[in-house]
Amino acid sequence: MTLRTAATVAAMLCAALATHASAAPTGVAAIQARLTNPDGGIVVVAHRGCHAPAPEHGFKDSAPENSLAALERCIAIGADVMETDVRRAADGTLVMLHDATVDRTTDGTGKLSELTLTDLQKLRLRSDEGGAQAPLTDQRVVTLEQMLARSKGHILLNLDVKDAIYVQVVDAVARAGMQHQVIVKAEAGIATPPLAAMLPFDKVYFFPILINAHGTADLAAVATAQTRNAHPVAFELPKMTAAQLPALVAVSKAHNVRLMVNSLWEGFIAGYGGDADAERDPDKVWGRMHRDGISIIQTDAPEALLRYRASLEQR
C-alpha cells in the first residue's frame, strides 16, 4: 500500500467514524431510542415528576408533585420519563392532578369535577406529596396543554389517565405533535383485546397494565394476549409474586417488549424491595430487577436511580 493510498483509507475511516458519531441520537431522540430498544438499558421514570429533593443537582427542597417545577427538575437531572396524572375539570379542561379532589395537593377543597380552570388557577400547590402540613408553594395546577408544551423536545411523559378521557388526551397529544414523546397506559386482563392496536392507543407509545386478578393471574397469558397483531412498547407489571416473573420475562423476550415495574413504597414484586431499600443498596433492588429482566423502573427517587444507572454504564 502506497503512502497516498494509506492516507486515503485513513481519511475515509475517520470520515466514517465522524459520521457514525454525529448520527448518535441526543436529547429526547436518545430517550426515544433507549425506550424502543429492548436492550437499551434502564429507563428511569419519575413518579409524579421529580418532586423529591435532588441535592446532587442543586435542588435541596421538594417540589409539588405533578407540577411544572417537578417537570423542570426532571429535565435538569436527566430523567428519561416523567409520569404524571391527567383528569378532567368541570369545564372540560384536562389538568395534571392525581386525586379526584384538590384537598391533598392544594390549599383548596372540593371535587375536581365541580371546579373549573378559573377555580383551579386560584389555588396554590402544596410541596412534595402534599397534605395539610405541607408548605404552600408558588406553583399552580398545570393543564395538560402546558405540560406538553414545556416537555416537548426535552423528556418523555407517561400519562396516567384517571378518567375515561383517553380520546381527548390523545387528541391533545396529537395537536401538540407529541405522539412519539408520550406514553399512555390502560389496564388489560385476560379477556381484554390487544389494546396497542386499537384507537386511540395506536397513536402513541402504549403500555398495557397487566391485571393480576386475585393475585394469582396467569400474567404471561395476559401479556401474550396483548401481543396478538399488536406491539406494545412495554408491559407494566402489577403487584405480584416473584414466582410470576420468569414466565413474563420469557414473553417479553419472545416479543421484544420491555417490562416496567414500580419500586415505589415497598415495591411491586414481593421480596424485591422498594425505593427506601434501593437507596440503601441500589444493586440489591434495582440491580436485581434489571438482571432479572426488568428494564423500565418507576421511582420516587429518580436521582438515585440515575446515579446507579450511570455506575452500571461505567463498568
Model-derived features: positions:
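Bacterial N-terminal signal peptides that target proteins for export
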Residues: 1-9
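Bacterial N-terminal signal peptides
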Residues: 9-18
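Phosphate-group recognition and catalysis centered on beta-loop-alpha active-site segments
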Residues: 23-315
